[in-house]
Amino acid sequence: MAARQQQKGTGFGVQYEDFVPKSEWKDQPEATILNIDLTGFAKEQMKVTYVHSSKMIRVTGERPLANRKWNRFNEVFTVPQNCLVDKIHGSFKKNVLTITMPKETITKVAYLPETSRTEAAALEKAAKLEEKRLLEESRRKEKEEEEAKQMKKQLLEEKEALIRKLQEEAKAKEEAEMRKLQEEAKANEEAAAKKLQEEIEAKEKLEERKLEERRLEERKLEDMKLAEEAKLKKIQERKSVDESGEKEKILKPEVVYTKSGHVATPKPESGSGLKSGFGGVGEVVKSAEEKLGNLVEKEKKMGKGIMEKIRRKEITSEEKKLMMNVGVAALVIFALGAYVSYTFCSSSSSSSSSSPSSSSSSTKPE
């Protein structure tokens, strides 16, 4: 029987070459012998199986070739009816697999008539035809199984590809959503940071404006204090000048003309009255000075406390109004004191100037 080869491939890149090995039947009186030529195969690369349901012997084997190719075979042989199944045995020598199938009854071919031999040959031919039919049917089934297997494998690969595609799409969608969320979070964070920075800058500007206003208020209060001190100093200087003038008027002696032409000092009575008048004015001025000094001292203490509060940023609107009222009151008191002093001094000077003129007219020499 001539060998035939057929190439088959799989999805894994391995190619199989199928072939039909040469086989030969030998009928002997004691047993039926089947010889199969398996050149190139080793004993470990083949397998012999007896199928009880169909009373057939299946011989399979495969061996690797070069370039990811394999050589394989799958043959089925019908076991003769006059055979002891449990005594079938085989051997592999010189690349030939020999399967021996002992007979139940030993026949002697030499004594068989010619008709028996013809019947035996016909039976053998029929057995070979049956064997060929079974072999073709077995190959057809194997082919169908292989096609079904390939179809199943293809469907599985398509299913895996679809699952992989869906997973990739889901992963890409998830990454896009995650990226979008990260961008939104970053934008919100930047907006919050910007808003916080703007609030800090606005707060700093407000603090600077408040500090500038406090500085202006301190400067105004300082200028007001300096102006009040200058006015006080001016009034005190004017008062001291007026007092020195009055003292000169008081200490100036009066010239009295007598009959003898001598100059005499003023009378003690008139001097004592004038002195007492100026003493009253001095007391008024002194009282005004004491009140003014107390008011100035109080103002200085209050000014120090206010300045301390301004430095500590604790001054209130009521304290500001109080400072303004104190300044105005001080100015009024200073003006009143100056006016009183000036009035008394003027009256004293007019009275003293009128006294010498009257005395001189009365004491004019005859």
UniProtKB/Swiss-Prot annotation:
Protein's membrane topology: Single-pass membrane protein
A- repeats: 129-133, 135-139, 156-160, 206-210, 211-215, 216-220
Source organism, top-level taxon: Eukaryota
Annotated region described as Disordered, given as residue ranges: 345-366
Region annotation (3 X 14 AA repeats B of [IMA]-[RK]-K-L-Q-E-E-A-K-A-K-E-[EK]-[LA]) ranges: 163-206
InterPro entries reported in the protein's UniProt record: A-crystallin/Hsp20_dom, HSP20-like_chaperone
Composition-biased stretches (Low complexity): 346-366
Transmembrane stretches, start-end: 322-342
One GO term of the biological process aspect: defense response
Primary location group: membrane
Region annotation (6 X 5 AA repeats A of L-E-E-[SKR]-[ERK]) ranges: 129-220
SUPFAM superfamilies: HSP20-like chaperones
Keywords: Cell membrane, Membrane, Plant defense, Repeat, Transmembrane, Transmembrane helix
Gene Ontology CC terms: plasma membrane
Cited CDD domains: ACD_sHsps-like (cd06464)
Family named by the database record: Belongs to the small heat shock protein (HSP20) family.
Described function: Seems to not be involved in heat resistance. Unable to mediate restriction of long-distance movement of the pathogenic tobacco etch virus (TEV) without causing a hypersensitive response or inducing systemic acquired resistance.
PANTHER family recorded: HEAT SHOCK PROTEIN 26 (PTHR43670), PROTEIN RESTRICTED TEV MOVEMENT 2 (PTHR43670:SF121)
Name of this protein: Inactive protein RESTRICTED TEV MOVEMENT 2
